[in-house]
Amino acid sequence: VFNSPTPKIAAELLEAKKINLVMDNWFFREAGSKSLPPFHHDISYFDFEGSMCVLWIPLEAVKKEDGISWVKGSHLWNRLFLRTRFNDGHHVDGKAGIINGKKYELTPNILKNKNDYEFLQWDLEVGDCIYFDIRTLHGGLNSVTPKKDVHRYTLRMAKENSKIIYRGDWAREERAIMEGNGYKNGDDLSGKMFPTLFEKS
């Protein structure tokens, strides 16, 4: 994370002077799992606001029909969708409407309206990666049951002037951790929880 070209590439993509780490995640899908990752965008899951990108890395080779699909251009829709859980039958947190001053909608039913969208998918080998805007809708497009365990790793990175902006109650657990470390609504994504990964000299 700290000693790789990753944040410099993020800075180029976001036209940023500085890149801070927002969070990293490790995803595991068990062999035989029939549950698809729901279509969602990461921006509404947590109390973060600003220009951010996600680095997505497969930890084993993946064919495009088995992997994640991205809805082309969805980062430009200027819409916020409610958080959809990956478990619990893809339960949606909250109700559509105005929450903390922002309008949230139900995520469109991508799977039932595939012809309405253009999708981006790739065959990937170990060592390949994808960067995408944190507002981009993505999820599982094809009902493929993995024969082996599937592992993915992601990094979320933020451009300077990104902020902590409180969203719905669904983010309260992560919010409590931030508040326990001295952060509050409106603070910059910087400091000990969000270290600087890259800064132009």
Question: Residues of each region from the PLM?
Answer:
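Short, surface-exposed loop/helix-turn segments at secondary-structure junctions
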Residues: 40-41, 105-116, 147, 168-173
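Long, hydrophobic, well-ordered secondary-structure blocks that form the structural core
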Residues: 16-38
